[in-house]
Design a protein with these regions (language model features):
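Short beta-strand "acidic-cap" motif of Rossmann-like dinucleotide-binding folds
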Residues: 1
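S-adenosylmethionine
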Residues: 4-120
Length: 120
């Protein structure tokens, strides 16, 4: 579990199951291609959340975005393609992105850039 707020991490450390790891930090600072799954809920608009989460996941892994009814799946799919992934499933309320190759050079972008200049 990754969160930029120390207060939330302390709470998670107390209540997380023993097989879960809590990391205090930002997605842009984490190891590339190191995790099997990343799940994002209320992190950012779905295309930005995809850009932050996909570099964390290794080839063959998945990113699960918890989204609202107005999420633009086509836009998220375009972003995913640029970061070596594809839109695999769309169960109600979620978008599942499957990582198809290692993270390309240039990702994750510098801190704040995804929000300032989102991928179209």
């Amino acid at each position: 579990m990754l969160d930029a707020e120390r207060r939330k991490c302390r709470f998670l450390e107390e209540w997380a199951p023993p097989n879960a790891r809590v990391v205090w930090g930002r997605a842009e600072e984490q190891e590339r291609d190191g995790y099997g799954v990343a799940v994002a809920k209320a992190l950012a608009p779905p295309p930005i959340a995809a850009e932050w989460c996909l570099p964390l996941v290794r080839e063959g892994g998945a990113v699960v975005l918890w989204v609202g009814p107005t999420a633009d799946a086509a836009h998220v799919a375009r972003v995913a393609e640029q970061i070596a992934a594809e839109l695999a499933e769309q169960p109600p309320g979620f978008l599942v992105l499957r990582k198809t190759a290692p993270t390309p050079p240039g990702f994750p972008r510098r801190m704040g850039l995804a929000r300032k200049r989102p991928i179209e």
